[in-house]
Amino acid sequence: MNKEALVQVAEEVRRATGLPVGWRDVERTLGALRATRDLWEAVRLSRVPLRFLVPIWEGLARRGLLRVEEGLDLLAEVPAPRPGEAACPACEGRGLVGERLPGRAAERFLAWAKERPEAIQDFDQGYVTPESTLARVALAWNWGDLEGKEVLVLGDDDLTGLAAALTGLPKRVVVLDADPRIVRFLERAAKAEGLPLEAHVHDLREPLPEAWVHAFHTFFTDPVEGPLGLQAFVGRGLLALEGEGCAGYVGLTHVEASLAKWADFQRFLLENGAVITELRDGFHVYENWGYIEQMRAWPWLPVKRRPEKPWYTSALIRLELLRRADLENARVEGDLQDEEATY
């Protein structure tokens, strides 16, 4: 397929779905299919949102280029570049390893992580590997965003707050999570380890209590990636930061977020005085969750097969404030997980 044909496929998908699909999305889709016939690996390698991939696959099948049976099989040679995989095996491409955190933080965290509550769909949960969590905390340590700092974690099925507290570096760690199981688990771990860690049940659609507004130096969050979810999670994080020089760590995917959404997110940050200082793609690797057949995307998939290895990843973005973010501390109305609102 030449570029003209790629553009044609993208335009057809845009007309049929209203999604901002570009010709590079089609090219990356084809490149991933050159590398694998496994649906989940194709999702990971393409870096294209799943909502885009399904209609692109359908368009390729109509053209006789793709056969969908037990896997995704290309039926013709295409000039799309095959995605390279040259990540360092020691750090899995992250550029740092959590095992170098101070003291016994990594050892103690790995022990506690084995006891964490199971991810459930009620709270749209899915947790990253322990190595991903430790590496995230290590990056914050590298930037001086832990030692002596007040740290806030917004949603914590990954146990980032626990990993940070176990380093012995933060002055205080506060975790907000809607799942009472997570809160009880963190309270038990904090008591057993003697940590300056507190956890609270809090629905991020609700305003932050005034005591938490402009009260922290660092926040961590992996937001629900619908437009309202980004507003609720990242907006609350910015509002919680004290002001200039404070930092946030945010996970953002390609599976659920198009480059158009990434652009809107970057504009949102700039409008609120935040600048991106680090962006490490594929930093977080997610464990496969047990409820995958119940996830919203399952009915769309042309091949109904559970993944055999991790496939869902997200980038880690570090942001820093140039000024205090004065966002409205109001209730966020609507469904944070609204699939039809994602793009």
From Swiss-Prot:
One Pfam family hit: BpsA_C
Segments passing through the bilayer: none
EC nos: 2.5.1.128
A biological-process GO annotation: polyamine biosynthetic process
Reactions this protein catalyses: 2 S-adenosyl 3-(methylsulfanyl)propylamine + spermidine = N(4)-bis(aminopropyl)spermidine + 2 S-methyl-5'-thioadenosine + 2 H(+)
Alphabetic keyword roster: Cytoplasm, Polyamine biosynthesis, Transferase
Gene3D superfamilies: Vaccinia Virus protein VP39, Winged helix-like DNA-binding domain superfamily/Winged helix DNA-binding domain
InterPro entries documented for this protein: BpsA (IPR014435), BpsA_C (IPR002723), rRNA_MeTrfase/Polyamine_Synth (IPR051720), SAM-dependent_MTases_sf (IPR029063), WH-like_DNA-bd_sf (IPR036388)
GO cellular component assignments: cytoplasm
Domain of life: Bacteria
Function (record text): Involved in the biosynthesis of branched-chain polyamines, which support the growth of thermophiles under high-temperature conditions. Catalyzes the sequential condensation of spermidine with the aminopropyl groups of decarboxylated S-adenosylmethionines to produce N(4)-bis(aminopropyl)spermidine via N(4)-aminopropylspermidine.
Record PANTHER family: RRNA N6-ADENOSINE-METHYLTRANSFERASE METTL5 (PTHR23290:SF0)
Protein name from the UniProt record: N(4)-bis(aminopropyl)spermidine synthase
Organism: Thermus thermophilus
Gene from which the chain derives: bpsA
